[in-house]
Structures are given as structure tokens and as C-alpha cells.
């Protein structure tokens, strides 16, 4: 069976890998799988980001949904978490987002949400993939009144914006610099922060279909850092292309990453008795300084594999309400079921406003250790078995002994490529270089492809 779904839906170069033909099939088969047990006409929300390929894929996807009798509500440009929110609150059968998140404009993606607002379970993805791989399409082909209908639904954006504002507090007297990545947040972030009475300055707000994430947004915060310093803003907020992640900038122009954002919000919730099980869910990539700050604060942590879907799975299974990743995916389950950059930004500003502390003061409680990551090309068959190689296991153990608890080593296989990732954290850059380079040399000698 072909593997179409990755960790965040189906992705590829638009019109080359992710074609209109595939989008049509995903609409048809995905719509069928997600609505086959509905007793009334299914209702599905569809949104996209600002990529030039978005309307092409949107049209094809919607045609597929209509072909199996689904009532489609077209949201236009909207943040990914907005789809998740509307699916839950408007009691839809499913939602679909057309976006490749932080990827460049030539890529695009299609991801589905079930009627609970969560991304699809593995068995649902497998069912869709089985239909994609079937020798022929045997699904029903309704006609006349059995066909689906299309409803333009611009009010979905207004409802999502109103929801975001209700989670915040009055930001009068605060200046906020926004970078909307020329993406989905460009239609909402300005209005939301104005409604919260903040003074704002905005960049990355002029999408042309080709400039999404291009030198702007959460993966390129340099322009925002300059804007914060130029305007004297209290904080800067950078979203990615579909606004499901956030990277912040403090008033001095320094980056505040997902680890620090989670700590700031988590500490605030913990002190109010609102942090479920007094626990934050994070991944193996979170910085050692983040872990030490949690320990000092008496906050527990649950650690998952890399990927926001694994964070969400742990949150759902154990009843936690805050989790996320260093990259800026932060899930606040009290409000939404997926990472939401604008929601997280509002909560961060709320903590600043209610504590009266600057972002640099709040972030200073987490001392970020220098971190280095090296990717080493290995045979696919060996990447999962690297730790079985005695020389590799021995050098890792030796380096960990030298660290004496004041550092961290993580060696893990890539989920999608024939790579072994070697990461280390330590108090100084020189120590990090030493640990990573020493381990990487042994890995290359033992199982590297270049040998």
C-alpha cells in the first residue's frame, strides 16, 4: 500500500506531487470515510492558506467532496486552528485545511480533522489510503439531489476571531509587533490584537501567493526582531504560514522559543491551579534548560516523540491541558484541540499584562543551553539499530559520563529520511561541539553511507 499521509497530512510540491487529481481523490475518499456513518447530510469545512496553488487544490478537493454528497462550507483563507475550532463548535462532520505550514510556497498539503476537531487517527488515514490504492473507485456516485452543495462561509473567519478575543485580556498600553508570514494569520491577527486594544505594527501582511514564509514568519524572525527594536514594542509575535505555531521576540529583540513560551504559560496556569495534573507535555527535543526550570518550579513533565500529533495524543490520553514543541507548536487544550499560534500569542500577552512583567523577565527563568544537531546519512536498515552497534553505544555512554548530569545527548533516527540525528546540549558551545562531533565521527565510521 502506498503511504500518502505523513505526520501532518499529505504534502508535496503542488501540481507535481500534490496534484489536482490527488486532491480530488482525497476529497472524495476522505469525505466518504469521515462521513459514512452520518444519518444526515454531512457538513465539511474547507480552508486554505495564501499559497498560489491553494485555490487550484481547493477547487479539486471540493469537487471530490461534492461528488459523495457532502455539504461543503468554503472558509477561504483561515488559520489551521480556525478550521479545528469551527468543526467542533459548528458540529461539522469534518474539516480540511490546505496548507504546507512553514514550508516554502511551491509546496502544499492537505490535512483532515475529524468531527471532534482533532487530526485523523491512524486507522482513518489507512482507510483513506486503501481507497486511494484500490484498482477502481467503487464508491457511490449520487446524482441530482444526492450531490453535495457548496456554501461560501466568510463568517467563519469572524467567528474564529471573536473566539480568540474572548480568551484574552485588555492589552491597552501594550505595543505588539506582528509578523503574519504572508500567510493565513494575515487575515486575522491585526483585527484580533486591535480588538484587544493593543497598539500594533505589522509585517508579512501582504501575501501574493508566492511570498508565504519567504524571509518572514516563525522560521525567519530576523525582520521582526528589527521591528521590535525600531518601534519599542513590548513583544513581537511571529506566526508560520498556517498560524499553528508561534515564536516570540522580547522587548530587547531576543528570540523566545516554544520551550520558553510553554514555561511562561505553564507557570502562570500552575500558580492559579489551572495546569491539569500540574504537568506540561513536551518532546524529546525540548531544551535541558526548560526541564531544569520546570523542576525548579515543581512542574511535572511528560515527554513524547517529536511531532505535535504525539504531544496531542499524550495530552488526550492522560488529561493534560498544556503541551507543545520547541518549534512553537503550543496546544492549550482548554481552548482548542491543535496548535494555535494566535491563541498562544494572546495567552502570552495576557501573562505579561496580568503579572506586570516584561517578556525578557518572564523568559529569564529558563536558561537555554547551547544545542547542536548533526544529521548523518546512514543506510535505512541501520538507522533504527544504531544503538545496537557497540562502538556507538559505548561512545554515547562515555560522553554522558563526562557530562555528569550537566548536559544531554539524544541520538534518534529521522522519521522520513535515511538519517541519524545526533543532538547534544551543554553549558558552552565548545562543549556541545565536542560531544556532538565525537559521537558523529564514530557513527560515520561505523554505519555512515560515505564509508
UniProtKB/Swiss-Prot annotation:
- Asked if Cytoplasm is a keyword of the record, the answer is no
What Gene Ontology molecular function terms does this protein carry?
Answer: magnesium ion binding; phosphoglucosamine mutase activity; phosphomannomutase activity
Cofactor comment in the record?
Answer: Binds 1 Mg(2+) ion per subunit.
Q: Which cofactor does it need?
A: Mg(2+)
Q: Which GO terms describe its cellular component?
A: cytosol
Can you tell me which residues form the catalytic site? 101
Q: Does the keyword Phosphoprotein apply?
A: yes
Task: Describe how it is modified after translation.
Answer: Activated by phosphorylation.
- HAMAP family assigned: GlmM_B
Q: What is this protein called?
A: Phosphoglucosamine mutase
Q: Which species does this protein come from? A: Streptococcus pyogenes serotype M3 (strain ATCC BAA-595 / MGAS315)
Gene name per UniProt: glmM
Amino acid at each position: 500500500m502506498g503511504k500518502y499521509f505523513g505526520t501532518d497530512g499529505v504534502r508535496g510540491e503542488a501540481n507535481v506531487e500534490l496534484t489536482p487529481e490527488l486532491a480530488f481523490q482525497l476529497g472524495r475518499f476522505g469525505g466518504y470515510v469521515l462521513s459514512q456513518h452520518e444519518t444526515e447530510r454531512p457538513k465539511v469545512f474547507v480552508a486554505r492558506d495564501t499559497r498560489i496553488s491553494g485555490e487550484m487544490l481547493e477547487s479539486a478537493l471540493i469537487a471530490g467532496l461534492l461528488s459523495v454528497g457532502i455539504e461543503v462550507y468554503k472558509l477561504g483563507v483561515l488559520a489551521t486552528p480556525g478550521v479545528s475550532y469551527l468543526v467542533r463548535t459548528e458540529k461539522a462532520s469534518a474539516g480540511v485545511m490546505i496548507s504546507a505550514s512553514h514550508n516554502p510556497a511551491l509546496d502544499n498539503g492537505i490535512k483532515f480533522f475529524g468531527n471532534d476537531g482533532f487530526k485523523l487517527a491512524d486507522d482513518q488515514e489507512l482507510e483513506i489510503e486503501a481507497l486511494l490504492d484500490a484498482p477502481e473507485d467503487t464508491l457511490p456516485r449520487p446524482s441530482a439531489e444526492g450531490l453535495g452543495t457548496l456554501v461560501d462561509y466568510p463568517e467563519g473567519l469572524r467567528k474564529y476571531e471573536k473566539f480568540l478575543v474572548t480568551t484574552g485580556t485588555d492589552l491597552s498600553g501594550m505595543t505588539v509587533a506582528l509578523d503574519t508570514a504572508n500567510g493565513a494569520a494575515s487575515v486575522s491577527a491585526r483585527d484580533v490584537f486591535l480588538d484587544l486594544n493593543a497598539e500594533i505594527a505589522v509585517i508579512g501582511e501582504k501575501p501574493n501567493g508566492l511570498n508565504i514564509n519567504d524571509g518572514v514568519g516563525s522560521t525567519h524572525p530576523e525582520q521582526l526582531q528589527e521591528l521590535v527594536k525600531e518601534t519599542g514594542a513590548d513583544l513581537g509575535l511571529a506566526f508560520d504560514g498556517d498560524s499553528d505555531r508561534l515564536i516570540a521576540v522580547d522587548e530587547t529583540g531576543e528570540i523566545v522559543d516554544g520551550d520558553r513560551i510553554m514555561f511562561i504559560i505553564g507557570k502562570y496556569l500552575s500558580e492559579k491551579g489551572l495546569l491539569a495534573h500540574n504537568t506540561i507535555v513536551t518532546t524529546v527535543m525540548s531544551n535541558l534548560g526548560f526541564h531544569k526550570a520546570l523542576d525548579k518550579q515543581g512542574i511535572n513533565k511528560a515527554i513524547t516523540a517529536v511531532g505535535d500529533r504525539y504531544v496531542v495524543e499524550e495530552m488526550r490520553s492522560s488529561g493534560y491541558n498544556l503541551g507543545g514543541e520547541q518549534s512553537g507548536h503550543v496546544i492549550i487544550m482548554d481552548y482548542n484541540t491543535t496548535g494555535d499560534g494566535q491563541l498562544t500569542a494572546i495567552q502570552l500577552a495576557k501573562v505579561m499584562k496580568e503579572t506586570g512583567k516584561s517578556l525578557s523577565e518572564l523568559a529569564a527563568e529558563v536558561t537555554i543551553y547551547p544545542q547542536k544537531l548533526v544529521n548523518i546519512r546512514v543506510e535505512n536498515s541501520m538507522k533504527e539499530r544504531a544503538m545496537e552497534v557497540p562502538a556507538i553505544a559505548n561512545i554515547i555512554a562515555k560522553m554522558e559520563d563526562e557530562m555528569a548530569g550537566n548536559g544531554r545527548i539524544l541520538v534518534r533516527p529521522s522519521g522520513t529520511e535515511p538519517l541519524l540525528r545526533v543532538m547534544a546540549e551543554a553549558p558552552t558551545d565548545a562543549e556541545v561541539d565536542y560531544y556532538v562531533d565525537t559521537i558523529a565521527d564514530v557513527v560515520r565510521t561505523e554505519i555512515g553511507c560515505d564509508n
